[in-house]
């Protein structure tokens, strides 16, 4: 299988996000890499589902709460940026203060 660097990055994000989802399901708190992967995956899948940039920016602040991440993570993650493919091209999605 021949994958571009971007495709490899997306697979890595997917793997880490899947691990994060499973840990959340078990009641475990996410660490920094798991948090970033989880949020990034939600953006990538939302774009694939046809959601707009503004929808994802708005919804992005509801995906995780402070009780779902380890202490100090909300302060470390004040912004998440990820490029996602939309029907009209690739766009940068920025979520400010994603953990409430």
Swiss-Prot record:
Enzyme Commission code(s) on record: 3.5.1.5
Pfam families: Urease_gamma
Keywords, sorted A to Z: Cytoplasm, Hydrolase
Residue ranges that the Swiss-Prot or TrEMBL entry lists as coiled coil: none
Pathway: Nitrogen metabolism; urea degradation; CO(2) and NH(3) from urea (urease route): step 1/1
Reaction equations catalysed: urea + 2 H2O + H(+) = hydrogencarbonate + 2 NH4(+)
SUPFAM superfamilies hit by this protein: Urease, gamma-subunit (SSF54111)
GO biological process, one term: urea catabolic process
GO cellular component: cytoplasm
GO molecular function terms listed in the Swiss-Prot or TrEMBL record: nickel cation binding; urease activity
Compartment list: Cytoplasm
Keyword Hydrolase: yes
Subunit structure: Heterotrimer of UreA (gamma), UreB (beta) and UreC (alpha) subunits. Three heterotrimers associate to form the active enzyme.
HAMAP family: Urease_gamma (MF_00739)
Family: Belongs to the urease gamma subunit family.
Protein name (record): Urease subunit gamma
Organism per entry: Prochlorococcus marinus (strain MIT 9215)
């Amino acid at each position: 299988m021949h994958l571009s660097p971007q495709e490899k990055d997306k697979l890595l994000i997917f793997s880490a996000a899947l691990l994060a989802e499973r840990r959340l399901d078990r009641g475990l708190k996410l660490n920094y890499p798991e948090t970033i992967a989880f949020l990034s995956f939600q953006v990538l899948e939302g774009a694939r589902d046809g959601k707009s940039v503004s929808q994802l920016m708005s919804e992005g602040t509801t995906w995780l709460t402070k009780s779902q991440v380890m202490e100090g993570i909300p302060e470390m993650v004040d912004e998440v940026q990820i490029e996602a493919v939309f029907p009209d091209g690739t766009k940068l999605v920025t979520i400010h203060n994603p953990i409430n």
